[in-house]
Amino acid sequence: MTKETIRVVICGDEGVGKSSLIVSLTKAEFIPTIQDVLPPISIPRDFSSSPTYSPKNTVLIDTSDSDLIALDHELKSADVIWLVYCDHESYDHVSLFWLPHFRSLGLNIPVILCKNKCDSISNVNANAMVVSENSDDDIDTKVEDEEFIPILMEFKEIDTCIKTSAKTQFDLNQAFYLCQRAITHPISPLFDAMVGELKPLAVMALKRIFLLSDLNQDSYLDDNEILGLQKKCFNKSIDVNELNFIKDLLLDISKHDQEYINRKLYVPGKGITKDGFLVLNKIYAERGRHETTWAILRTFHYTDSLCINDKILHPRLVVPDTSSVELSPKGYRFLVDIFLKFDIDNDGGLNNQELHRLFKCTPGLPKLWTSTNFPFSTVVNNKGCITLQGWLAQWSMTTFLNYSTTTAYLVYFGFQEDARLALQVTKPRKMRRRSGKLYRSNINDRKVFNCFVIGKPCCGKSSLLEAFLGRSFSEEYSPTIKPRIAVNSLELKGGKQYYLILQELGEQEYAILENKDKLKECDVICLTYDSSDPESFSYLVSLLDKFTHLQDLPLVFVASKADLDKQQQRCQIQPDELADELFVNHPLHISSRWLSSLNELFIKITEAALDPGKNTPGLPEETAAKDVDYRQTALIFGSTVGFVALCSFTLMKLFKSSKFSK
């Protein structure tokens, strides 16, 4: 509930006691003589007996049926209507005029129907709506009145009905609370009174909450899990007697209610089933205790439309233009725990059934994953099941490419804190200058790097990606149409671990390479050619000529298929010559059959991302003294000028002082 102010418009025939209700409610006493129509009255939160359920302010709007224009104006700005009648004539007018009039205005707001002037009622009797407060401050509401039932059946916009008396103060606070509750805890999204069932969206939300609360994945909520859910949602323990009452109630329903006679709602020694959890919340809705259900739903960030709050799924994160987003230690820890929780057979991999259970409380696999052939975009075991290493690598890639997807799925998985705590933003990329050229500075705070693998078709790019994931070489050639991704972790000297993303661009290669914004996501470009194909290297030369801005990025030349006979390239310049001309390393000769050469390449790519200056074209080696951060140079120069100016000013003052003393 995000509304801070609720507007309650009080309607009804002349003489039913609308103004008296307002005065008696606010003054706590009955005043016989008052004006016909009261001005709007604002009631603060602390007036309510249940401040947790109340908005910041509730405005009561008194109306008169003699001025329909003013009445309609107020109705159109109302959040809830308090419709009052007091006798047979005004009761008939409710269904013959008032409710049809609301419909004619196109209003889609709840109506609280109130029978006023019930002065003879001193307590709730069998003919009135029973309203009582139990030990948990929940409201149990039941309509048992011959007047109310027919009108409730005909007009679904009526939220509930109540009898009041302005003269004796009977149920005034309760009526006011029901007006608030119709907005703060609406019944309509949860329960379909016409069929007597929870609505589909409510069922979906409650099923997801059950799955997240079933910590041991046994399909039952045992006493400890119920206690945990109770503390999480209501910040207090559940009474043993109340818990036993719930169990007995569910057992009784499953034995005697024909609808549930063959369905287990509670199993002694195991706990409440998913069906039992749904039935319990259905009972809350039927008895007017849907505040309980809403408390559960809102703890899990559901809005009034029963979707998870978008601000929770996609929190705003300030990311500078040259920064990237990675998982924090807390994020990695949570994802490790999720993996271990759903690895039921403890074989170190998530099979299809385990993945299905894991993603059951989400909308399904992320779109990024389905478009990149998950799980074969990362490390899988010999059964094709994603390993923990592959799981963490996949989420590292997802966070780097689209952190908003990660925050959403963290919430879906049940991450309890602000999803931003599971992420960390790297420092903005600094630029340095050497030989008049700007290039990227060294990196020391990142663990995830992105590499575009480009080259002529059939030069071995796909085999390179497969080898990166530890898969054996295949002789079968399959051209890459859509972009492909491979992500894995690797360890450099010193034991520091990094995640490397290799992207093969497919038919989108030209479009991506000419998109300078897309290239900002790229840390290294791996220029691959087939050393056994004399026509292969010319493709790279033409790319570098066409997209000259590629030379602003670190480049790594790779000569693939080195196990085959090396061919002279039919090109105006040979690979080694071009590398020398660009001041980058000579091509690294690799083969999918030589594992050591592949490992050397992946380490080389990562090192190029960490130290861009050694691999960016057009940067001849210079002494460290000449290769400095251009911002630092400006700072040092400015400091020097300032120091000289200060010394000059001091000397002038000393000179003038000396001259004056003479």
Swiss-Prot record:
Changing E354K: Induces collapsed, globular or grape-like mitochondria. Its EC number is 3.6.5.-. GO terms for cellular component: ERMES complex; mitochondria-associated endoplasmic reticulum membrane contact site; mitochondrial outer membrane; mitochondrion; outer mitochondrial membrane protein complex. Residues 656-662 are mitochondrial intermembrane. InterPro entries: EF-hand-dom_pair, EF_hand_assoc_1, EF_hand_assoc_2, EF_hand_dom, Miro, MIRO_dom, P-loop_NTPase, Small_GTPase. It comes from the Eukaryota. Changing S462N: Induces collapsed, globular or grape-like mitochondria. Keywords: Calcium, GTP-binding, Hydrolase, Membrane, Metal-binding, Mitochondrion, Mitochondrion outer membrane, Nucleotide-binding, Repeat, Transmembrane, Transmembrane helix. GTP 1 binds at residues 12-19, 62-64, 116-119. Ca(2+) 2 binds at D343, D345, D347, E354. PANTHER family: RHO FAMILY GTPASE (PTHR24072). This is Mitochondrial Rho GTPase 1. The lineage of its organism: Eukaryota, Fungi, Dikarya, Ascomycota, Saccharomycotina. The gene is GEM1.
